[in-house]
Amino acid sequence: AQSVVAGTNIPEMIESVKQLNQHGISCTIDNLGEFVSDREEAIRAKEQILEVIEAIHEHNIDAHISLKPTQLGLDIDFDFCYENIKEIVSKAHTYQIFVNFDMEDHSHLQPSFDLIDKLSEDFDNIGTVIQAYFYRAVEDIEKYKNYRLRIVKGAYKEPEEVAFQDK
């Protein structure tokens, strides 16, 4: 995990990112966690991400944010999650920091795209992951082709009804 985890706190993360930046490497910062079912936990996750955004700005490091909607309350309530993510995206926009949406399992796919669609009405600093093994991936790439996209294989075991089984 040490090769992909920059640290367990913000000072460790800043130091790791600075070292990578010295080698011309830009970084993605992901506050690990997903599938949150408690409002307070989702709010804590939001506050942690806002602190990371402040640290990126304060230390002038080359990094952007990656987030998972379920960590910010998607399984609790769509509007609650939207408000949490909007606060993050707005703060990041203020500092010209990009925010990438990680995609989760198929049951969260469309609600995550709905969040992106709604946020993109006011913000241009968002992008998304497209999981290539979903049957709908080509359509999603076409729809979001003007966004910053990261195409990935996909890490979740998905049913045959929605995804290719041989990766």
Placement of each model-derived feature along the sequence:
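Positively charged, amphipathic and often flexible ligand-engagement surfaces
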Residues: A1-K167
